[in-house]
Amino acid sequence: MNILNKVKVKAKWVIALPLCFFAVLPSSAQKQDDMRQTVEYLASQKLGGRYPGTAGDTLASEFIVDKLRSLKLKPVVKGKKKKAFYHDFTYGKEKQITTHNIIAVVPGKDKHLRNEYIVVGSHYDHLGMGGQGSGSRRPDTLGVHPGADDNASGDAVVLELARHFKKARSQRSIIFMFFGAEEQGLVGSKQFLEWMKQEDNQRKNLPDSMKGIVAMVNLDMVGRMRDSAMSVSGTGTSSRFKAMAEQAAAQTGLHISCVPDGYGPSDQASFVAVDIPVLFLTTGGHMEYHTPDDVPSTLNYDGMQQTLDFSKELITQLASMPETPDYISVPSSQTMKHAKFKVTLGLMPDVMGASRIPGLRADIVVAGKPAHQAGIRSGDIIQEIDGKPVKDMNEYMERLSELQPDTTIPVKVLRGEKMLTFQVHLTPAKK
């Protein structure tokens, strides 16, 4: 090689290296852009809130199926290609509604472990136009409830997980599932598990029975991350889950709050009810929850990227662990949450415990209710109620159970760096 050729080679490297460097950069940005586009479509006015059985529900399911088909994932139903990714079901007593779960599979590459399946899921339905009995926090106001965080955010992350694991195939098989009618009482996840209990020669690429499902990971409301914090429930439902979650968090820079049991108001509860270990990821509640204001512009897309990175690490560990995940029955930490109280403060606390600051954050303080009238605001971190400390949700519920209506009690909160005390006049809780 002569000197001129050496110069040419060096020049090529000088040019090529920056090009290679810049070629890597768009990857994360592209994923965020893809997730943003998914959220913006699913939470658009055009889809009308994605209520089961409506035109918006159909458009949402078609959008997701098109994505899965473009990724060349395996369908689950024999016969017509158009219905290959749909598990249809009908529910309701007074009014029958037909909708579906959307399901696709990435087969595992290990000849033994590929017969064990992990479900990675999110629900794609929402509240439609809201109204009385819909679950809306503004039941007297009819309007599209877009459901950007609940749960277009989860759908966007699960689609990116499907893209990732299609390329980086895992040892175990992964079922990617988008549940219908979750807001109606976890209907889709329950219907899927009932389907898996039955013999059906129209199924394909799924385990022969429910016993082939060894774990479930659920993502619901993962679009409003704060302070790089996330709640992971179900960490006690299998021996290694807590250590795996902590390792994934350390690798991705997340601060996680681990909740041992897998119960709660989302689809993982259907799986833990039939003794399948679960992990439930969420970034928690907010003022826009179940209102027309849950729109795409309120989401933290950098945080969704962090959720995606964390989920990849967690699922990779889960899909490659040599032993089958064991199931451990964990008592529900929700017991006190469903107790009846004589009073209400009129706030929604951070039930996931995602805040790293001591105390219990008031995620939503309802206008006109006792806490709001006293001066407490969303984001305040409760330190004491009636002179007794509040460190977590259980202590909050315990304090609430001790209070009587038509009394006034001090509530101490941390707001920024200031410790404030408000006198709250308690009103009777609705029966």
Question: Language-model features: where?
Answer:
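Bacterial N-terminal signal peptides that target proteins for export
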Residues: N2-I15
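Active-site-adjacent substrate-binding region
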Residues: V222-S329
